[in-house]
Structure formats: structure tokens, C-alpha cells
């Protein structure tokens, strides 16, 4: 790899130059979006994306956590990290007590922005636990070809939109900016796939198709089902990771300890105690990643017309995804009071019914 006099690889300069030449969208200011390989991406993560595509060497033992932004990433990171490291750390002095889940599981899209940071991953012991917000189409070829395991979490699009809008407000505040993004404008951009990481529908479809084409490689989780049954989710997660809970662990309540450690309330309280700035770029504070940790908040933001439009887009985007198997559904079965419905023949990404959700909240089932 040829170096310049400043020590920066020549292709690094090329990546920076390439980013500045890509189509620009500033409707989410101060977040600048660039269109790269057909996908709108945050400008901040583009050099890292390019570096990862060129230099990252995946291993068959790697575990990759993938998600569309604001779909349950923080919770998934905490659960996976705690499950994989449960024999190394006691719950009383666990790393999650003083580290944010995003500090425990690095985001490939960001750390690859520095080749020095990317090279440090090469020295990490197996199995490496890494996360990404990249759609499947933008993943490094080494990830696609090495056979490493992928864990994907998706969320009802309307709730994802609302969560992203609130998170954007935190970005504006933490950067000391005054721009306010009207919800209606973000709604239009969301419908047009002009969002960081592109289309939520194409994002989910990419990993869903990988799941159906390579059985056993992808664990496809749904945020709302995680909320409804965290213990069941944790059991599936541990089995997929190859470290199922032993009879002794079940007897002494290890799974319950992990669920409690990674609960929304506990992680939020820990984040408020930590009270410091972390990634991306030191912009966000530890508590910025926690708001409600619930399903159904879209009802407080979307008009019936907005909700109907998103549901129509979802139905159109996911039409024909069954292909002889189970169909991916991202549309809520609970739109404006319709009866909750779920069958064993479909994989529904459902929002919990209001009446069921109230019970879940009282039992502390709402998670980050």
C-alpha cells in the first residue's frame, strides 16, 4: 500500500476526495448525507465504510451485529456482550456498569475510519464481536464470503422513524447547533429512503434474504418480540452463539441476571451515572442512546394518514418476499386499534397491542 509523505495511504486521500464528490443531501443538517453505491449514508461514516470494504478481513469465528439505526442496537449489543462474556465477569462488577454497550462492541463503520484502529481489530482474540449499520450490499466482501455469523434486529418502521427523529434532535443539541428538523420533513425523507443507512425496507430485506438463502447463518430478531419475551430471545441468542445456558446456569438464574443487567431501566440509569461523551466522534453522551425503550410511540407523532402511507410503502416493498418460505412483515398488526394478530405461518414484526403493552411495562419488560 503506497504511502504519502504524511504517512497517509494514497487511497485514503482518494477516499476523502471521493466522499466530497458524491451526491450531497443536507436536509438533515447538521448530518450530511452522501449517496454511495446507491445508498444514502452519513458522511461521517463513509471513509470508514470504504476502508472496511477494502481492508477489513473477516474471520469465520466473527459475530456481526447488524441493524438499521434506532432499531434496538444498544440493547442487542448489551445482551450479546453479556451472554458471550458471562463466564469472565461477575454481574456485580460487570463492564456494563462503567462502559456503554457501544464501547463494548465497536461499530465497524466508525472504527474503520482510522486504519490504525482498524488494524487493532486484527489482534483481537476470537470470537470477535463487531457491529454495523451497513446494509448487506455494502458489507466488506470478506464478511459476505467467510461464513461468519450475523445477528440482525429490525423494528417497526413507524417507531424507527420516531426514534430517529428524537435522536437527531439530540445530535443537534450535542453539537451546539440550532437547526430544528420538523417531523414532517423527516417523514418525507424517510418515505423517500433519504436516511442514514438508506431505506429501512431494503436494509431489512437484504439480511432477510441472506437468512433464507444461507440457513443457519443469520439470526433474525424483531425488536417487538424481544420486548414481549426477553428471556426467550436470550435463549435463542445464546444457542445461536454456540454457548447455550447450562442446567446449572438455569438453576442459579444466570439468564435472569443478564436480562436484568441489560434492561432498559438499568442501562439508562448506568448511562446517566457515567455521563460522558462517546462515539460517534465524541458527539453523543452516554444517556443519548436511551429514551423510552418501548413500542407504539409512533401513535404520539404520526397522523392516521402518515401511518397509512408508511404501511402502504411497507406492503409494497415486502410484497413477494415469501418465495416458498415465510414472508417478512414489517407492518404492525395494531394500526389504530386493529386486533392484534400473529400466526405461526408468518414472521410478523408486530407492535404489541396497547392492552398487552401496558401489562408489559408494569412487569419491567420494556427494554433499550
Whereabouts are the PLM-identified features?
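Alpha-helix initiation and capping sites
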Residues: 201, 227-231, 252
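C-terminal, well-structured subdomains that either form a transmembrane helix-short loop-helix hairpin
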Residues: 220-233, 237
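Short, surface-exposed acidic
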Residues: 243-255, 326
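PAPS-dependent sulfotransferase catalytic domain
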Residues: 1-221, 240-241, 272-345, 352, ...
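Short, intrinsically disordered C-terminal tails of secreted or membrane-associated proteins
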Residues: 359-363
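Non-catalytic, well-ordered alpha-helical segments in soluble enzyme domains
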Residues: 86, 233-247
Amino acid at each position: 500500500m503506497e504511502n504519502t509523505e504524511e504517512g497517509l495511504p494514497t487511497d485514503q486521500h482518494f477516499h476523502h476526495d471521493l466522499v466530497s464528490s458524491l451526491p450531497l443531501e443536507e436536509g438533515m443538517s447538521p448530518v450530511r448525507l452522501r449517496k454511495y453505491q446507491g445508498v444514502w449514508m452519513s458522511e461521517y461514516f463513509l471513509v470508514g465504510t470504504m476502508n472496511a470494504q477494502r481492508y477489513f478481513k473477516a474471520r469465520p469465528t466473527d459475530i456481526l451485529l447488524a441493524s438499521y439505526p434506532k432499531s434496538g442496537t444498544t440493547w442487542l449489543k448489551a445482551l450479546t456482550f453479556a451472554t458471550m462474556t458471562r463466564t469472565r465477569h461477575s454481574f456485580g462488577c460487570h463492564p456494563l456498569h462503567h462502559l456503554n454497550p457501544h464501547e463494548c462492541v465497536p461499530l465497524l463503520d466508525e472504527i474503520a475510519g482510522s486504519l490504525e484502529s482498524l488494524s487493532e481489530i486484527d489482534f483481537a482474540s476470537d470470537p470477535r464481536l463487531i457491529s454495523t449499520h451497513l446494509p448487506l450490499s455494502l458489507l466488506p466482501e470478506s464478511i459476505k464470503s467467510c461464513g461468519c455469523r450475523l445477528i440482525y434486529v429490525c423494528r417497526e418502521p413507524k417507531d424507527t422513524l420516531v426514534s430517529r427523529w428524537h435522536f437527531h434532535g439530540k445530535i443537534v443539541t450535542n453539537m451546539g447547533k440550532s437547526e430544528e428538523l420538523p417531523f414532517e420533513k423527516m417523514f418525507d425523507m424517510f418515505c423517500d429512503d433519504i436516511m442514514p443507512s438508506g431505506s429501512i425496507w431494503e436494509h431489512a430485506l437484504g439480511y432477510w434474504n441472506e437468512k433464507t438463502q444461507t440457513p443457519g447463518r443469520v439470526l433474525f430478531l424483531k425488536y417487538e418480540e424481544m420486548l414481549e419475551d426477553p428471556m426467550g430471545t436470550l435463549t435463542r441468542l445464546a444457542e445461536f452463539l454456540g454457548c447455550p445456558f447450562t442446567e446449572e446456569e438455569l438453576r442459579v438464574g444466570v439468564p435472569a441476571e443478564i436480562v436484568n443487567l441489560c434492561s432498559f431501566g438499568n442501562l439508562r440509569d448506568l448511562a446517566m451515572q457515567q455521563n460522558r461523551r462517546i462515539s460517534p466522534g465524541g458527539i453523543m453522551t452516554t444517556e443519548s442512546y436511551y429514551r423510552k425503550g418501548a413500542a407504539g410511540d409512533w401513535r404520539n407523532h404520526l397522523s392516521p394518514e402518515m401511518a397509512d402511507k408508511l404501511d402502504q410503502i411497507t406492503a409494497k416493498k415486502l410484497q413477494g418476499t415469501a418465495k416458498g418460505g415465510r414472508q417478512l412483515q414489517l407492518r404492525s398488526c395494531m394500526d389504530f386499534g386493529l386486533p392484534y394478530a400473529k400466526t405461526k405461518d408468518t414472521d410478523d414484526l408486530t407492535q404489541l397491542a396497547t392492552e398487552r403493552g401496558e401489562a408489559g411495562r408494569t412487569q419491567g419488560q420494556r427494554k433499550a
